[in-house]
Amino acid sequence: MTEPLKPRIDFDGPLEVDQNPKFRAQQTFDENQAQNFAPATLDEAQEEEGQVEAVMDAALRPKRSLWRKMVMGGLALFGASVVGQGVQWTMNACQTQDWVALGGCAAGALIIGAGVGSVVTEWRRLWRLRQRAHERDEARDLLHSHGTGKGRVFCEKLAQQAGIDQSHPALQRWYASIHETQNDREVVSLYAHLVQPVLDAQARREISRSAAESTLMIAVSPLALVDMAFIAWRNLRLINRIATLYGIELGYYSRLRLFKLVLLNIAFAGASELVREVGMDWMSQDLAARLSTRAAQGIGAGLLTARLGIKAMELCRPLPWIDDDKPRLGDFRRQLIGQVKETL
């Protein structure tokens, strides 16, 4: 009762009533609209990733054209004729005791055997490259699965393909973290966070070293032709080393196929992804005012090598990217700028 009374407050006019309705109007659907209703897909990133995987799968799958079938049929007929003629020559040489002709037949058989063996080896390596895309799809399915039993077998197969020994600390931590009550999604997620980063770290180091060598070579060398040859050789070597890290043995045709897939992946991603990864701070640093033209060209070549390595890493990994574990081009850019500043 000791509190003073508050003064009276007078308003000049009446209170304004909000004329806008607080609730939206009712929306009803008839039977035809209800039957044709389809929910909207909100996950655009997964849709884009699915489009990229579809393009990669189409590129990996050989095109069965009529000319290809005719060529393969002709080669098969020619091979059968060569084998039949060789058998006939060998029988005639044995009957006539023509040891020179018999030696020539033996040499021809060795050459044909070596050729067939190389073709089979190339086909096996190319098939292994195609299987990596299917393994990535299987891993994506397991990451959304609530079943049990398949995840551990799948991860053990990946570790064996990558050459990870059973006594490796990362693999031992993974074995200690899993138990029988976990489903396939949890088992594969643990493998992706405990074992897979070991290979990813080695691939990142290879990309950083190749990008730095390309940057310094372009910044120092005055010969453009030598620069182009060096960059091409380093990029091919980088793709080979990344594929070897992830347990993929490349032959001649599989190496060309992987290089084609990397370039196709870069072209499919477009320039928007490049701008998003590099960021707007590229222009804000005003490199042209502080570095020479050759140094700026070297940084551009290094970024191209790094982007090539990232895409090769993405195609050779047996697991899809989870959370934010995908390497960013901006991280390599900062390293390249620092190395150029220290060198020049």
UniProtKB/Swiss-Prot annotation:
Residue ranges in the Cytoplasmic topological domain are 91-99, 234-344
Q: Which residues lie on this side of the membrane: Periplasmic?
A: 1-69, 121-212
Q: Where is this chain primarily localised? A: membrane
Segments spanning the bilayer are 70-90, 100-120, 213-233
Q: How does it sit in the membrane?
A: Multi-pass membrane protein
Keywords from UniProt, A to Z, are: Cell inner membrane, Cell membrane, Membrane, Transmembrane, Transmembrane helix
Gene Ontology cellular-component terms for this entry are: plasma membrane
This protein's source sits in the domain of life called: Bacteria
Asked if the record carries the keyword Transmembrane helix, the reply is yes
Its localization reads: Cell inner membrane
Q: Note the HAMAP family from the entry.
A: UPF0283 (MF_01085)
Family statement: Belongs to the UPF0283 family.
Instruction: Supply the name of the protein.
Output: UPF0283 membrane protein YcjF
Q: Which organism is it from?
A: Shigella dysenteriae
Report the gene name.
ycjF
